[in-house]
């Protein structure tokens, strides 16, 4: 009989087996209770740190600082001492002067009735900085669609230049005056003269499409495309022709007229490809 069989035979004939198992269970329960109690003890006194923790802490380069010395200093002195011990490379110098030793001013040239303006970025810019400089120039040129740059006022701020000017609005007064003069001439003519000329086929066709939606494509991240129609800007056919009697070349042109009529064109140009 091997050792396993002998052990089974012994346990089967052991009189105190039940008592031994009960003692083992009670011992296990006491151990678990003590473990749970230790988890909620807040003040356990000054217990020595296990050696494996000490070894791990001593290997960390961040703990090389003399902590005992810091406890003897006031809070302000601790901060000053800590800053003195920082590596020089970690200190940030905000007073570094930035100058461009080599810079070419803009040059305006005229050739055969055409003008050209050459703009030169400061020498030494990184690729990212050069792109930022270029986008700034493009933004200034883009703004000329909304106002007359030559009339803008340039204001110096602490960290920027501010351009201020009057927003350009669509001028339909010439068309209205032209129509009024035609109507006045017709009223002075003989009674047999025909009435006002009917609207062109194109104009009638555009208003017939007053409920047709046109998609404005977004050109900014985070801005969704927008669907608009003529009735979003004009309450009636009369209002449409009172804004610009000559009409528009196409439906998108009429939408643009509506945006200008509601003074929304400048905002739309910043967000959508118009």
From Swiss-Prot:
Modified residues (Phosphoserine): 59, 61, 236, 242
Its biological purpose: Nonenzymatic cofactor regulating the function and conformation of the RNA polymerase and part of the transcription and replication complex. Binds the viral ribonucleocapsid and positions the L polymerase on the template. Acts as a chaperone for newly synthesized free N protein, so-called N(0). Plays a role in virion assembly.
Region (Hinge): 166-202
Record bears the keyword Glycosyltransferase: no
Gene Ontology CC terms, in alphabetical order: host cell cytoplasm; virion component
Chain positions found as Phosphotyrosine: 14
Site (Involved in oligomerization): 133, 136
Region of interest (Interaction with the Nucleoprotein-RNA and template-binding), ranges: 254-274
Protein family: Belongs to the vesiculovirus protein P family.
Biased composition (Acidic residues): 54-65
Keywords noted in UniProt: Chaperone, Host cytoplasm, Phosphoprotein, Viral RNA replication, Virion
Region Interaction with N(0), residue ranges: 1-59
Subunit structure: Homodimer. Interacts with the L polymerase; the association of P and L forms the polymerase complex and positions P optimally for encapsidation of newly synthesized genomes with the nucleoprotein. Interacts (via N-terminus) with N(0). Interacts (via C-terminus) with N in ribonucleocapsid (via C-terminus); this interaction allows to package the L polymerase in the virion and positions the polymerase on the template, since P acts as a bridge between N and L.
Disordered, as annotated region: 22-65, 174-204
One Gene Ontology MF term: RNA-directed RNA polymerase activity
Species classification: Viruses, Riboviria, Orthornavirae, Negarnaviricota, Haploviricotina
Species per Swiss-Prot/TrEMBL record: Vesicular stomatitis New Jersey virus (strain Missouri subtype Hazelhurst)
Biased composition (Low complexity): 174-193
Residues marked Interaction with the Nucleoprotein-RNA (site): 260
Subcellular location: Virion; Host cytoplasm
Domain notes: The N-terminus is disordered and is involved in binding N(0). The region of interaction with the L polymerase is necessary for transcription. The hinge region is highly variable. The central domain is involved in oligomerization. The C-terminus is basic and essential for binding the N-RNA template.
Post-translational modifications reported in the UniProt record: Phosphorylated in the N-terminus by host CK2. Phosphorylation of the phosphoprotein is required for the transcriptional function of the P-L complex.
Biased composition (Basic and acidic residues): 27-36
Region annotated Interaction with the L polymerase, chain positions: 49-101
InterPro entries according to UniProt: P-protein-C_vesiculovirus, Phosphoprotein_C_viral, Phosphoprotein_central
Protein name: Phosphoprotein
Region (Oligomerization): 104-165
Gene3D superfamilies given in the database record: 6.10.140.830, Vesicular stomatitis virus phosphoprotein C-terminal domain (1.10.8.440)
């Amino acid at each position: 009989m091997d050792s396993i069989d002998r052990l089974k035979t012994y346990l089967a004939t052991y009189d105190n087996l039940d008592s031994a198992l009960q003692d083992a269970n009670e011992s296990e329960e006491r151990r678990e209770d003590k473990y749970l109690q230790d988890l909620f003890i807040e003040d356990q006194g000054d217990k020595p740190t296990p050696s494996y923790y000490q070894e791990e802490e001593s290997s960390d380069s961040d703990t090389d600082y003399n902590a005992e010395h810091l406890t003897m200093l006031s809070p302000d002195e601790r901060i000053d001492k800590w800053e003195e011990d920082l590596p020089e490379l970690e200190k940030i110098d905000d007073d570094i002067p930035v100058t461009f030793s080599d810079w070419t001013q803009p040059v305006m040239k005229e050739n055969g009735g055409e003008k050209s303006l050459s703009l030169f970025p400061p020498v030494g810019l990184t690729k990212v900085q050069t792109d930022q400089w270029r986008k700034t120039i493009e933004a200034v040129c883009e703004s000329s669609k909304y106002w007359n740059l030559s009339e803008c006022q340039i204001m110096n701020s602490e960290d920027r230049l501010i351009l201020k000017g009057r927003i350009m609005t669509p001028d339909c007064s010439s068309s209205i005056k032209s129509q009024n003069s035609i109507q006045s001439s017709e009223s002075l003519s003989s009674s047999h003269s025909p009435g006002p000329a009917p609207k062109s086929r194109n104009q009638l066709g555009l208003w017939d499409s007053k409920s047709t939606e046109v998609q404005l494509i977004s050109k900014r991240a985070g801005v969704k495309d927008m669907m608009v129609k003529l009735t979003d800007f004009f309450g009636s056919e009369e209002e449409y022709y009172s804004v610009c009697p000559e009409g528009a070349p196409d439906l998108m042109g009429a939408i643009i007229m509506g945006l200008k009529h509601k003074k929304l064109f400048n905002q739309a140009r910043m967000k959508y490809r118009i």
